[in-house]
Amino acid sequence: MVPGEGILADATPQLANAIAAQLAARGIPFNEHAIYSTPALLAESRDVIADWSRHGWHGVDMETAATFAVAKHFGARRAAALLRVDDLVSEEHSIADGLHGDHRRFMRDREREVMHAVIEAAAETP
């Protein structure tokens, strides 16, 4: 599937833009890309990963698309700020190896910073 085909479980642009602005204001690097949704945790073979990467998807996630689809159905605002824990394409920082020491602390701190940015963005966006 190519991004944009099928059912589009997209973010509310105003909320997504507000989150991006909050992240930028805090100096938190971010990227905005399409995410591939899968119904099975850790079920992607190397071939599946290569295929979705080749088609422009920049990550994989289980929950976001379902949450967005339900929110969209009910007319609710929706956006996500996902933290990349590992890179399935280049296989760097594999979650299978676990997070250790400084990397674990960094991820915990970054998670907290992103959460505050999202809360602030949601509070300021109608």
PLM feature segments, named:
Residues 1-126:
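Glycine-rich phosphate- or other oxyanion-binding loops that anchor nucleotides, phosphorylated ligands
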